């Protein structure tokens, strides 16, 4: 019910942008207090295809979730670091900037379309957010309730913030935890899982996260609490995995999905899919075949947008 109301309000904003924002904020604040979703769109991909066009196509199916700004981050295995491209305004601005993704090379990445909650609509506040030297790059849907406390603690450690967002606090906190695990004899995956585990314990609020680590090309991480997130298991032709805030984003590429549960973490590569609980214990999750087409998925399986 909440999801359908939320989509209806997003539709109203698209049709009547001058008059719907106040209604939207009333409803979205209620949803946040009661564990519902905050509207932003997340897409991620790792596989054998070029990631940027896939990310942008997926985001076009999630644009009802936000059109204040959009961005993508893509890693080319031959490049020294992750490339981040962001644009203020509707997704078409980002598509023009990147030649519909063709100008950004690499087979692993994350994308985001934003409806502003903390920080004004701007390129600086757009996702993805990144740490120094892009050691950690992160997209987020939700609200980090204790972001100010985290921000102040990180500033005392010498971290410098570029944006006004709660998401950057989560990104730099994850970077801090990841850095602390260096030299401890852990594998890169173990370090990442430990850092994400600590983040999930420290952060209060709702979140769905898509994460890239600069020293792990081709690996895509995801985690969630009280904000929706799925894994798409791509066809042999695409040979890889996706993440998304909602089913429509992946239906152009696969009908097979895994629903990430609350307090769960996903680690994805082109060939492997691992799901963990918050204690970093690997768990089995069923693959669900979506029977709807893309148009029906946008209505969550219902016949109409309105009841």
Residue map of PLM features:
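Basic polycationic patches enriched in arginine
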Residues: 4-7, 21-22, 33
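Conserved short alpha-helical segments that host acidic/polar catalytic motifs at enzyme active sites
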Residues: 29-304
């Amino acid at each position: 019910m909440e999801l359908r109301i939320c989509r209806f309000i997003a539709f109203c904003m698209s049709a009547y942008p001058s008059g719907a924002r106040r209604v939207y904020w009333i409803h979205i604040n209620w949803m946040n207090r009661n564990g519902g979703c905050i509207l932003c769109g997340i897409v991620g991909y790792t596989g054998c295809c070029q990631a940027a066009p896939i990310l942008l196509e997926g985001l076009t199916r999630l644009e009802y979730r936000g059109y204040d700004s959009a961005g993508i981050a893509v890693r080319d295995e031959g490049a020294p670091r992750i490339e981040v491209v962001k644009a203020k305004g509707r997704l078409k601005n980002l598509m023009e900037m990147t030649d519909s993704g063709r100008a950004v090379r690499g087979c692993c990445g994350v994308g985001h379309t934003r409806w502003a909650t903390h920080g004004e609509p701007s390129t600086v506040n757009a996702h993805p957010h990144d740490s120094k030297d892009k050691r950690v790059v992160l997209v987020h849907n939700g609200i980090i309730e204790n972001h100010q406390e985290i921000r102040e603690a990180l500033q005392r450690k010498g971290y410098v913030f570029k944006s006004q967002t709660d998401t950057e606090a989560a990104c730099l906190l994850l970077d801090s935890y990841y850095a602390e695990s260096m030299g401890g004899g852990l594998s890169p995956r173990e370090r990442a899982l430990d850092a994400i585990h600590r983040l999930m314990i420290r952060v209060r609020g709702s979140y769905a996260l898509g994460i890239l680590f600069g020293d792990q090309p081709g690996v895509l991480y995801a985690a969630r609490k009280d904000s929706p997130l799925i894994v798409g298991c791509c066809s042999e032709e695409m040979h890889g995995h996706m993440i998304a805030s909602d089913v429509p984003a992946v239906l152009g590429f696969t009908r097979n999905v895994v629903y990430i549960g609350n307090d769960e973490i996903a680690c994805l590569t082109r060939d492997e899919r691992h799901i963990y609980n918050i204690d970093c214990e690997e768990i089995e999750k069923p693959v669900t075949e979506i029977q709807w087409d893309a148009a029906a998925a946008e209505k969550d399986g219902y016949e109409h947008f309105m009841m």
